[in-house]
Curated annotation (Swiss-Prot):
The keyword Metal-binding does not apply. Keywords: Disulfide bond, Ion channel impairing toxin, Neurotoxin, Potassium channel impairing toxin, Secreted, Signal, Toxin. This is Potassium channel toxin Tdi-beta-KTx. Residues 53-87 form the BetaSPN-type CS-alpha/beta domain. The lineage of its organism: Eukaryota, Metazoa, Ecdysozoa, Arthropoda, Chelicerata.
Amino acid sequence: MERKLALLLLLGMITLASSGLREKHVQKLVTLIPNDTLRSIMKTIVHKLAKTQFGCPAYEGYCMNHCQDIERHDGSCHGFKCKCEKS
């Protein structure tokens, strides 16, 4: 039962993370999980998924929107991550 719950939480967090929500929003959900090994594993997974921006190669203009939202700069896709240009 615990394995099924962990898998369900993992899939839910992956869905939320890939839908454009930022890591800070998903980490708020992680705090609802009791303190134990499962919580630390889930926090690590969410952090790693948040660092990889799946929308970068898939959606044209994703990095431009991402960088405008975060840093108010132009952005371009570099591998699987957005690269925000500095002024």
